[in-house]
Regions:
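Active-site rim beta-loop-alpha module in soluble metabolic enzymes
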Residues: 1-64
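Short alpha-helical interface patches
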Residues: 18-20, 88, 107-111
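Hydrophobic faces of well-ordered beta-strands that scaffold small-molecule active sites
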Residues: 25-29, 65-73, 90-94
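Active-site-proximal loop/turn and secondary-structure-junction residues that shape catalytic pockets
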Residues: 31-33, 75-77, 98
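Residues that form or flank phosphate/diphosphate-binding pockets in enzymes
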Residues: 36, 78-79, 102
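Short, glycine/charged-enriched secondary-structure capping and boundary segments
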Residues: 41-44, 83-86, 106-109
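Catalytic cores of alpha/beta
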Residues: 75-89
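C-terminal helical cap(s) of enzyme catalytic domains, especially alpha/beta-barrels
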Residues: 98-112
Length: 112
């Protein structure tokens, strides 16, 4: 499903345009079961999926290493530091925790 979603999303971009999107596109991976549930994927799962996306972009679209891939899925101040340490995670997509200023500031601090 994920592979199909990415391929469909990028299918209308011409080959010569691919190099110019690297500064304009960010891909966010958020497991559907994690949306608003408080459940977070395991670090291993996050790394595997992000690695899969990077390789797909590199092999099929020749842009894999240039497109940031961020993780979303119940990111909060308690788990963000560990998420930032995962290979191939270029950042996080913060939902509910962004509504709590102190929590959001801690997530930002964890990213540094």
């Amino acid at each position: 499903v994920l592979e199909e979603q990415i391929k469909i999303s990028l299918s209308n971009i011409k080959e010569f345009e691919m190099s110019s999107i690297k500064n304009k596109v960010i891909i966010a991976y958020e497991p559907i079961w994690a949306i608003g549930t408080g459940k977070v994927a395991t670090n291993k799962n996050i790394e595997e999926v992000h690695s899969f996306i990077k390789h797909l972009l590199k092999d099929d679209f020749k842009i894999g290493l240039d497109i940031p891939i961020i993780y979303g899925g119940s990111v909060n101040e308690d788990n963000s530091l560990d998420i930032f340490k995962i290979k191939n995670v270029d950042g996080v997509l913060v939902g509910g925790a962004s509504l709590k200023p102190n929590s959001f500031l801690k997530i930002i601090s964890n990213s540094l």
